A protein has these predicted regions:
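Extended, low-polarity transmembrane helix blocks
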Residues: 1-22, 64-136
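A generic alpha-helix surface/boundary motif
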Residues: 18, 31-32, 54-56, 78
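Solvent-exposed, well-ordered loop and adjacent helix/strand elements within mature globular domains
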Residues: 18-47
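Flexible, active-site-adjacent loop/turn segments at secondary-structure boundaries
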Residues: 26, 41, 60, 91, ...
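Core segments of alpha-helical transmembrane spans in multipass integral membrane proteins
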Residues: 43-63
């Protein structure tokens, strides 16, 4: 396995571990101040419990090679909701954006086709060729 793939897998495992152990488990377990924190965000603890389950599912999908792309798309959507929630209540919102970027970078390092799609836009070859001739 190449060094690039190893780095991608290390980032992926660390990210999934963070999602499961630092984020989802906080939604699934009881702790002091949990209800107040979630109420500030506009969610009750029942909804947060369900979100924790979904978060674990997405983290697992992200780690399985056959479902990693869909898992990353779902993770991005989930983190978009987290970003919007934090913006709405005036909390710092950069963390979910950084996590989403790390997820896409990790997936791209694991599977170079992800970066290829982003850079080469394979489904718009004519448009890309026109843009390339204009810039030269």
């Amino acid at each position: 396995m190449s060094k690039t793939k190893v780095v991608g897998w290390v980032l992926s495992v660390l990210l999934a571990a963070f999602l499961i152990f630092a984020s989802a488990l906080g939604k699934l377990t009881e702790w002091e101040g949990k209800q107040d924190m979630f109420a500030k965000l506009g969610w009750d603890t029942g909804v947060m419990y369900n979100i924790g389950i979904v978060e674990i599912g997405i983290a697992v999908m992200f780690l399985i090679p056959r479902t990693a792309f869909v898992g990353t798309v779902l993770l991005t959507a989930y983190l978009g909701g987290a970003t919007a929630t934090h913006v709405r209540v005036g909390d710092p919102f950069i963390a979910p954006i950084v996590v989403a970027l790390v997820a896409w970078i990790a997936l791209g390092l694991r599977d170079g086709r992800v970066f290829g799609m982003a850079i080469h836009c394979p489904n718009c070859q004519v448009a890309c060729d026109k843009d390339a001739t204009r810039s030269t």
